[in-house]
């Protein structure tokens, strides 16, 4: 297939090289799945730094359906329109059928999980909520996720979903299938299919709705507002603890030293981007080095847990997207870590859910601002406590009993957030800076 990918690639939401100079995007591997449908792996070559690899399923013919013509059309190949096949219902149904058949096409292996049924006749639609992958929902039954930027190794999203599903854990969407290839002697995960959580609500949306209701009734306490989230926070804590316990049972645990030096290095790097952190460095380093001679229990965990990675269904909470921290190599994302990292991620997310509204509502009324800040702090405290209560009830151990460890991981997360906000969203920088000051009190 002869088609130029550069212009199209750089316009995609999932393209990670926007801040780099792309020299070329060449076809490194192409697998013909059927006439007019190819799985293409692209080598993105840059003026400096390492190359990146991306996956595109390319269809050729009359083009994608009209509403997606701009985002999906790649160019002209051999006199025909080449386009992203995920925007073609017939092509996506065919991809699902390959998984259903556990087919092998050249060096691409499709695998259906045991004892599952795939909704081959369900209508597909592209799901537009992701930044790094592309997903297609089939009816209300399954969601097909295509990994866009691919790296060698075992993919934790497939690996951990498979472990949890086969163990019968109720707090994940069941894995239905996956597909992978081998390139230059190394395995590459290409995509997966899980049950679709129809009629679900994202935890972030639920939490921010609760804070909106609280701020609309600023003279009421959090427990007095109709949208109080504490009960859901408790049940979420139970769900996270259940997943942690299941992963520990299935994949084991080990003891490792607390990573004081690693956290200190991240702090030093963040100070370069956020000079406001400098005044806090001695106290933060003191917190880290206080734990330097201690060991902690580590296991496989989610690794990037926050309220945007959990869904509330009619049956309970689900944890989704076990990919780990974006941008890290797969081996790093698969490294065992303390469950406290996931707990800290949720607690930091509560902080954001409340305080982002203060940023958005900033005005000239100082009394009103102080009142809302007090309500936000109260909301965060109440929901953090409820989450930890639920976690402790399920796990039998309370993360607050390891207060120094929990605070260290909250600080590490807040330092990362500060660097991110300084680069991408400066108006939100006061959120992590305020959290750091509070954690050091």
UniProtKB/Swiss-Prot annotation:
Gene null: resulting phenotype: Cells lacking this gene display maltose accumulation.
Pfam families associated with the record: Mak_N_cap
Catalytic activity: D-maltose + ATP = alpha-maltose 1-phosphate + ADP + H(+)
Keywords from the UniProt entry: ATP-binding, Carbohydrate metabolism, Glycogen biosynthesis, Glycogen metabolism, Kinase, Nucleotide-binding, Transferase
Keyword Magnesium tagged: no
InterPro entries associated with the record: Kinase-like_dom_sf, Mak_N_cap
GO biological process: carbohydrate phosphorylation; glycogen biosynthetic process; trehalose biosynthetic process
Pathway: Glycan biosynthesis; glycogen biosynthesis
GO molecular function: ATP binding; kinase activity
E.C. number(s) listed in UniProt: 2.7.1.175
Subunit structure of this chain's protein: Monomer.
Family of this protein: Belongs to the aminoglycoside phosphotransferase family.
UniProt function note: Catalyzes the ATP-dependent phosphorylation of maltose to maltose 1-phosphate. Is involved in a branched alpha-glucan biosynthetic pathway from trehalose, together with TreS, GlgE and GlgB.
Protein name, entry field: Maltokinase
Organism whose genome encodes this protein: Mycolicibacterium smegmatis (strain ATCC 700084 / mc(2)155)
Phylogenetic placement of the source organism: Bacteria, Bacillati, Actinomycetota, Actinomycetes, Mycobacteriales
